[in-house]
Amino acid sequence: MTTDIVTSRINFYPYTVLPSAKPVYQYDLSIQVSTQGYNLDNADSYRALEKFCEQQDTALGNDPARSLFYSLIVDFPSSDSRPISSFYSQTDLGSRPVTHTVEFLSTQKPKRRGGRAGGMRGNRGGPSTTSVQALVKVTRVRQMDPLDLMSMKTLLNILLRRTFESSLGMLNIRSGFYDLNRTSTHNIQVDGRGFDICWIPGFRLTTATLYGKLGLQVLPETTKVRSKSMCELLNENRGSLHPNALAAITVMAMHNGRVFRIHSIVRGQSVVSPLAEGSDTDYFTYYSAKYKDKIDSAALSLLKQDDYCNSVLQRDKFILKLTPLKKTHNGKVVRSCNVPSSLCIIISDNEIAPYGVSKLSTNKTAVALSTMSPDALLEKATEFANQLIDNAELQSVLGDYGFRFTSQPLELDTFVCKPPKLMMDTLSRELTVEDDSGGVFRSLIQSPGVSSIYYANNGQPAVGMPHWALMVPRYLKNDYARRLKQELTQRIRSLAGATASTVEEPLLIAVDVNEQRRDMYRIEPYKDAFESLLVKLNTQYPDTKNSELISRIQLVVVVIPGPKQYSGGLYKEVKRFYTDKGIVTQCLLTPRLSRDGPEWYDQAILNGLCQQIYAKAGGAVWAPALPKDNAYSTSTMLCALDVSRPKKTVGRPTEVPASTAGFISTYEGSFEYIYSQKKNLMPNRLNQGGEVQQQTLMKTFIKNSCEVYSAFNSSLPDRIVIFRDGVSDGQISTVLETEINSLYEYLCQRYREANRPMCDLKVIVAQKTCAMRLAAVSNTDLRPGFYILNHSPDNKQKGSEFIMASQAIVHGTTPKPIRYKLIFDSTEASMDNSSFKQLIELTNTMAYGYVNWPQAISLPHILHMAHLLSKFCGEILGNGRDLLESQAIFGLQYRPFFI
C-alpha cells in the first residue's frame, strides 16, 4: 500500500507538565441579578467576580496585595453578550459552594425606546452607571488531572489567551512582543532591478494533541482575500470615499520572488488573461510589462520614506480583510483562499480603495499577501518558539502552572498512499492519475454508463437520457439555442461511451423572459416554459396523464439570466419548483452579450457542465478503484453524515435556525452510485446546533440504506464504514452514547434476522480544523496521500487516529491535512494491523471520487457530498418535506441532484 516512509517535521512544539506543578481547580460561576429587566453580560460578570473576590479576601484575611482575584484564570466566552461561567485557580476554595451578595456599577445603557413622547432618542448618552445587586455563587467542579490531555489543553489555551490578545478563538501575538526588525526586509527583483521591500511577520498560536503529547502550534496569520483583478482595482469607479477608506495600493502578491495576482493563485506558472490578449504568459512577465511604472514608483516612494517604514514596523500589525467572492473567469474557477500574512509586501501608492474596512485609518497602507512553503513556515515558527522561551514573563506564568515546552518542532515518520486508479469505461480499463497530468478530462474516453436502477417516479427502471429538456431565454436567439443543444448532446454522448445510443437530443423550450432588469429574475416564465414542455411531450404520448409525463423527464437544463449576484433568488426558485416535482435540474448562466451577440462559453465550463449533467442523470464519470487485495473493495457500504446550520435570521441574532442532516450511502462496488436522505432537526438547549443525532434518526438512515444495498446486491454488506463530520473532541463521547451504541444494537438484530454474522462496523470522525503543517526533513515536497499515525496512549478511550492530506502540492505549500479518528470499531483492530492500513487506503482513494474535480479533494467524496446535500436542502429547499417522507422527491434520492 505504501511506497516509502520519510521523516517529516511538523509545526508542533511539545509541552511537558513539570513534576512540581501545583494543583489547579476548575470552578463554576453562577450570578443571579436581582434587578428586573437586566441582562448580565461579559463585562458585568467580570465586575461581579471581582467584588466576590474582595469579600472572600476579607472573610479569609488575605493580603490585598495577593488578592484571590489576581490568581484567577478566567475562561471568557466567545461573545461579549454572554456572562462568564467558568474560571480556574490554584487556590482551593473547598468542596462546598461559596456564596456572597455583591453590588457593582454597570455601564450598560438602557434600551432606547425612541419615536414617541417620553422616549430617550434625545438622551444619547444615557446614565453613566447603574448600581446592580447580584448573588454570586462559586462551586468547585474538579481538580485538573495533569495526565488528562484535554484538561491540560483547555487550561493552556486559557493561559495563553490571558497572556496574548484573543481573536476568533485563536491567540494573536501582542504588539511589541516579537522583534520584527530581525526579519523585516526581503530583497525582490522587479524588472531586473532590486528593491528592499518591508515584510511583516505575523503569527498566531493554538494548541493541539499529537502522539500523546500536548503541543503548541505556531501558525501564520491568515485572512480571506477578495477576488478582484488588478485591472478592476486600478480602473474601478471609486465614487464617494468611505470615511475609513484605505490610502495606498498597487496590490501585488509575492511568492519566491515573483509577482502573483492575489485572487487567482492557481496551479502552474501560467495564466490566460484578456489583458494579455488571450495568450499564455507567466505572472511575473505579465505584471512586469503591464504595471512596470506603477511597481517602480510605488517601491521607490516607499524606500525613500525610511521613517515611514520604521513607524509601520513599530505599530500594531494590520491585515486587509475583504469579502471573499467566487466567480469563473476564462475557464478558471477563482476562489477566495486563506493566505498567510507572515510575508506581507507593503507597496505605497497615491490611489484610494474605498473598501469600507473598519478599524483602519486613512494613513495606513493596504497589504498584499502571499503563500509560504512549509519549510519557510517551520523556520520562522521555530525562531518564534525560541522567542517565546526567552520571554521571562511568559515562562513565569507557564512555570507557575507547571508547563514547559521545547522550541524544536516534532519529527515523525510519514507514510504515503499510492494514488488510486480510475475505472474509465465498461471494460474496467484502468488509467493512473498522475499529480501533474492536469486532470483526467483529457484522458476521459468512456465511463460505466447509466446503471439500471429504480429511480423513476413510476417505479420502472430508466436507462440513459431518453427524455430531457433545454430551456433557453428567447432573447438569446435561435442560433445560440441550437448550438448549445448540439454541443451538450455531443459531449454527453462522448461521456456515455457504450451507452451513447440511450442519450437522445433534448427538447428545446423557449422561455419568455422580460429583458428589463427588474422583471428578468422572476420564476413565472420558467413555470410557463415547463407547461410548454408538457405540451410537447403530450404530442409524443397522447392520452397520458401529466403525472406520467413528468415521471418520464430525466433532467432539465435551465439557462437563467446573469450575472450571478442578481440571479441567486431565481436559482433557488427554479430548484425548489423542479425538486418538488421530482425532476433533476442543471442551471447555467447566460453568456455575456456583446455587439456581435452572446459570447460563447469556455470549453472548460462546458466540460464541467456536462460532467454534472451526466452524473445527475445517473451516470458515473469515473470511479476510483481499490486494489483487489484490499478487503474493502468488495461487499462494503460507505456512509457519510453531515449537519449544516444556515445563517441566523436577519434581525433575530439570538434565534437558532433549524439544522439539516444529510446522509449519503453507497450500494454498488465502485462507490459512485449513491442513495441520499435528509432530515430537518430542531435545535434544543443541550444540542443547540443539532450536531448530535437522535437514536431513531440514525436507525432510520441505516435501515433505509441497508434495504437499498440489499435490493441491489441481494445481500447485506460485510463491512459498513460511516464517516462523520462536525464532531469535536468534546462531543465524541456523546455521539457514541447517543448514536453509535444504539445503531450497533440495531445492526446486530438486523443481521441475526438475516442469519448473517455481524458486519464489520467502523465509525470515523473527520475533523477539518486540523491546522498542522508538515515538511519533509530532506527538503523535498511531501507527495499527496501522505499520512501519519497518531500512536497515543489516550487513543484507548478516543479511538485510533491518523492525519492525512490527499490533495496535491500547490506552489510548494503542503495542503491542510484532515484528522481522522476511528471512534468505533467492532473488530477492535490495532493500528498496526493490515486492516487498519487498508482503511487508510480506502479513505485516500475516496478523495478521488468527486465528479466535479479531476484530482483529489480534501475529504472522501461521500462526506463532501453529504455536506452538499445538507447545505442544499437547508438553504435551497428550506424546511420542506424530508426525503424520507416525500414520494415526489424519492425519485431523486438515487442521483446527486445537489452537486
From Swiss-Prot:
Residues 107-129 are annotated as: Disordered. The keyword Cytoplasm applies. It comes from the Eukaryota. Its main location: cytoplasm. Keywords: Cytoplasm, Developmental protein, Differentiation, RNA-binding, RNA-mediated gene silencing, Translation regulation. GO terms for cellular component: cytoplasm. The keyword Cytoplasm applies. Residues 116-125 have a biased composition (Gly residues). Residues 229-313 form the PAZ domain. Transmembrane segments: none annotated. GO terms for biological process: cell differentiation; regulation of translation; regulatory ncRNA-mediated gene silencing. GO terms for molecular function: RNA binding. Residues 555-878 form the Piwi domain. It is found in: Cytoplasm. InterPro entries: PAZ_dom (IPR003100), Piwi (IPR003165), RNaseH-like_sf (IPR012337), RNaseH_sf (IPR036397). Belongs to the argonaute family. Ago subfamily. Interacts with miR2. Highly specific binding to the mRNA m7G-cap. May be a component of the RNA-induced silencing complex (RISC), a sequence-specific, multicomponent nuclease that destroys or silences messenger RNAs homologous to the silencing trigger. Plays an essential role in growth and, with Dicer, also involved in microRNA (miRNA)-mediated translational repression. The RNA interference pathway is implicated in antigenic variation having a role in regulation of variant-specific surface protein (VSP)-coding gene expression. Several VSP genes are transcribed but only transcripts encoding the VSP to be expressed accumulate. Antisense RNAs corresponding to the silenced VSP genes are detected. PAZ domain is absent, but Ago is capable of binding small RNAs in the same way as the other Argonaute proteins. This is Protein argonaute. It comes from Giardia intestinalis (strain ATCC 50581 / GS clone H7). The gene is Ago.
